[in-house]
């Protein structure tokens, strides 16, 4: 195992090439000053890809390129009605000419939830609604255990899988490269946005 990993170590693993890296860094000098910090920098992963931004695209970049997904044109996955994961999957389905069975459960309505739901509904998708995640899992346990449901291969919730996680590992290595290149000082602390945890 290499002493110091770089993104090059992951280049032997198939990817779709959707991530435009490195994502830019935004220096927030005024906010850093207000908080008495030496620096404050935001990594703009919302600009990960023209397809759709965010870490889900990083995960799908590896997951959907893996051998078990080659030729799969019908997918199923789960998320709340405003799920960023289902947005990324709907965009991926359109890009790869696939179809997504989106199994959704309730969450409180916000503008972002409405926008995400509209995006998923406008894609190559069939939406199946459940009142809550418990009833969904009881009625369709394969949505969380994996396999095939209704002829569709199940994408793990949040695209969280060993191969999908490589997208996040690559993001961390990308940030390390940016620090090494002097694009930002070595951070004392890293804060990561946490939605559903998927």
Residue ranges of predicted features:
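PLP-dependent amino-acid enzyme catalytic core
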Residues: 1-198
């Amino acid at each position: 195992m290499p002493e110091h990993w770089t993104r090059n170590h992951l280049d032997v693993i198939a990817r779709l090439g959707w991530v435009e890296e490195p994502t830019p860094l935004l220096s927030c000098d005024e906010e850093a000053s207000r908080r008495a910090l030496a620096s404050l920098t935001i990594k703009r992963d919302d600009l990960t890809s023209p397809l759709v931004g965010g870490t889900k695209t990083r995960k799908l970049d590896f997951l959907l390129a893996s051998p078990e997904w080659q030729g799969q044109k019908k997918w199923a996955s789960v998320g709340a009605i405003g799920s960023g994961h289902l947005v990324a999957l709907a965009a991926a389905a359109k890009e790869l000419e696939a179809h997504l069975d989106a199994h959704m459960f309730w969450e409180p309505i916000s503008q972002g939830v409405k926008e995400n739901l509209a995006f998923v509904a406008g894609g190559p998708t069939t939406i199946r609604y459940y009142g809550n995640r418990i009833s969904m899992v009881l009625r369709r346990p394969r949505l969380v255990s994996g396999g095939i449901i209704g002829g569709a291969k199940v994408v793990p919730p949040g695209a969280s899988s060993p191969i999908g996680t490589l997208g996040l590992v690559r993001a961390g290595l990308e940030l390390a490269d940016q620090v090494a290149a002097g694009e930002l000082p070595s951070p004392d602390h890293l804060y990561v946005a946490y939605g559903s945890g998927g």
